[in-house]
């Protein structure tokens, strides 16, 4: 790109801490986006999303959140459980209550318990404390807001019904993708021009991506995020994941073509 950028300023952002959801907010706080009009990102895709050698113009990431539920009951000897409030029993019903929440079935949403911990220190003791961790996802940001409200209500009301104290905390939220259609089409055209029409794949879904914090912090920012098929298998984040490095230049070519057209 040296010598090709003749209009404006090009920033190459190598953002840390994406997995902890702290990287993008740190970039925002540092003022990196203050003078930015367009933000374009990319990520390799697993074989299930995009075939090797193909590129999708938009990765439709969902909103994601981690919700921590703490249940406080009353300990008792297991021979006299009626004298206590068994927080494992409460946890089972809390998980069931969350699973019983129904949102629009035509949309994308899910909540699943990924951790549960309770240990009174003995096998014959009713535990007075239990914690649950939920992984929560939704296809749209307003849907996520409603989902979290319903989850909070389900947890708290279940606790009251069983005479336990339940607190719900969702400290971090990764927003869903909100793209600008005209910019996505420009990315699609760059894919056609560099990789060929036959290698433009349909949009794919995805996990969470804190790139979308940029748009949430600066709504006027035009954003797009494409996915490069590199044959990643068995999937992203798998400890035994492998992918074909020969396809990485496909993503580079899209970036270069887009920047040259936009700023050359």
Annotated model-derived regions:
Residues 2-115, 122-125:
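Histidine/acidic-residue-rich, glycine-tolerant segments that coordinate divalent metal ions
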